[in-house]
Amino acid sequence: MKNILLATALLVISMYGQSQTKVFKEVNQDVSSEIKAIVQDGSLVGYVLFTELEKASDKTFNYRVTIMDENLNDIGTIKFEDEKLLLQQVAFEGDVLCLAYIKSNFIGKAFDKVRDFRKQKAAGVRDSIFTQFVSLDGKIINAHSIKADITSDGEYDHVKKKVKGEGELKHQVQLKNIAGTGFAMFYGDENKNQLVTYDLRGAQIIKKRIKDKGDDFALLTSGTDVYILVRTDSHDKTFGSEYSMLAYRPSDSTTLPKYKLTDKRGNALKVIAFNNDPVTGKPFVSGNIIERNALKYDNVKEMKRGAYVGVFTINFKSTRKADVTESYSYWNDGSAPMFMGNGLISEKDAFARQTLSFRDYSGNTYFVGSSVKKKMRWGAIAGAVITSPLLVGPVLFLAGGTQKSKTSDVVVMKQTKKGDLTVENSFKSDAGKYFQAKTPVDVYDVRSYYTVTNPDEKISYLICYDYDNITIYNVNEKKVMRTIPRWKGSLETSVFPAKEGHILVAQYDKKQKSRSFSIEAL
């Protein structure tokens, strides 16, 4: 979660019911802050407000880190001076907070003149991954810097009339806690992908270069084990990918066997969830099964042809074959009666395109996404027929094809532990507009999702972001609990995960130039 504030000054802290609210007001354009969630074992346990204050010198800045609990109460503050820092990730374990930054003498810095920018770049760019270990009372326990090779350049800011140094890692910093042990961090620069682990004193345990090649990497910790999911895209054949699971045990420096994810029918996969099971605490991977000869374009024409052939869930106790259980559910073999062979949901006359997956407390895997409808462009076809003697007319009318598509209801599917697949429910969201059927669905399916859970009551909630509204859906009760407008007058509202069973509602008032954050129970 990230919200950039041009500047912050705390105006009010108020308590009402089960909600606490903080309001921040913009007061100085030279001060910037961002708020990030503190995560432990996948659960949000607090927040960090990272503020860049005034310059301390030509090369350094003053910084303030405010530590807040899950109810937005301040519990500690640290102030320090350093080069330009860009906060990436925050994790918590054993009363120690680990913050990971990109440190640079170039990236993120603003230069008044182009010649100053060129002079700095010619003098040499120094980039590093900077980790800081902080106690809850605001004391810095330890800190480390690892040199990073980042391709950098400049971008001219036409508003501030300055040149800003730009650059980013090839694979962004990922930081997780290791239960009872410390922290694991992964990042990839231009020359290497690296896993680094630390103990609770901030001492480095492992620094390991990941030699496996991939287009993307995802880090997850489970107990004392560290997992990395490697994705390799086909690039020239299908929009599915190949995946491998790497695993390490920092406690004794063990490297576990690599496990390749495959459905045994030669199909490609598309992972949409890599997380820990809420009951066992062990990793699972779930997603779509893509037909082996599917084209690279993820559009409704390919869906009609049968590009999506099912869904899968793979459970890991470790990456040893005996510790892995797989569940593949296909609709192209007739084993899922609610689906046609090409994935069309019979009762909805629409294709389900799953973009989120999660587990419940009964061992079921859920798949969520927009239903996609296809329709003939009868007006264009009629126009082409009428103007057929003119030759040019049909070309103009049929330039967009004879079919169109759009997103419709949100569909919730369930795969049981036995692999049975059903459509559990659907609910309405903002109405989408029609696009040419050959248009990739990513272009017009703007919905995004995440989940919030209540472990005590074993309830899962689904949060759906759409064009104009945010919908909160109770998965257990199969009903919409609340709909929140994203835009109302001068207010812009966003909703983020908070502590278990709660959400964080963030509102920006354009007129008052203020931001408020409140924790609300579901």
Where are these regions (language model features)?
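Short beta-strand elements that form the blades of beta-propeller/WD-repeat-like
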Residues: S43-D58, V90-K121, Q132, Q174-D189, ...
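Bacterial Sec-dependent N-terminal signal peptides
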Residues: M1-F24, L522
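Start-of-domain marker
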Residues: Q20-L86, Y187, S241-Y243, T280, ...
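Surface-exposed loop and turn segments in beta-propeller and other repeat-based domains
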Residues: D82, A143-G165, Y259-A268, K321-K348, ...
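Blade-loop segments of beta-propeller domains
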Residues: N71-D116, S145-G165, K207-T224, L229, ...
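Beta-propeller blade signature
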Residues: N62-N71, R115-K139, L195-R201, G240-T254, ...
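Long, internal scaffold/assembly segments composed of regular secondary structure
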Residues: L219-T232, K237-N364, G369
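Repeated scaffold domains used in trafficking and secretory/extracellular systems
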Residues: D30-V39, F80-F92, I150-Q174, D212-G223, ...
